[in-house]
């Protein structure tokens, strides 16, 4: 548990440093806060928790403009890069497992500039 919290803090700090946001865009702090309950699933754990899916749905609702969606994408891309044991299949499957559709794949290789 302590290790998960430490990793979540590292992800939060990395997102704030690596992905500066345009004015008015969703913040990396909000993205990582919403998705921090997903860390166990993203590193190969069992299916996403209700708290994780709640965060995914909250993030989807908050990212309602193209700049917000691009900012959220960049934050998730940066966060994914900093998770050393990221299970890429779980990351890509997360939205579907939570019953939502996002307009891009959660991946370190996603081109967030193409997100509309």
Curated annotation (Swiss-Prot):
Cysteine disulfide partners in this protein: 28-75, 38-52, 53-98, 73-112
Function: Plant non-specific lipid-transfer proteins transfer phospholipids as well as galactolipids across membranes. May play a role in wax or cutin deposition in the cell walls of expanding epidermal cells and certain secretory tissues.
Name used for this protein in its record: Non-specific lipid-transfer protein 5
Similarity comment: Belongs to the plant LTP family.
GO biological process: lipid transport
PROSITE patterns xrefs: PLANT_LTP
Residues annotated as signal peptide: 1-24
Residue runs in coiled coils: none
Pfam families from the UniProt entry: Tryp_alpha_amyl
Gene Ontology molecular function: any one: lipid binding
UniProt organism field: Lens culinaris
Superkingdom, taxonomy of origin: Eukaryota
InterPro entries the record matches: Bifun_inhib/LTP/seed_sf, Bifunc_inhib/LTP/seed_store, Plant_nsLTP
Keywords attached to this entry: Disulfide bond, Lipid-binding, Signal, Transport
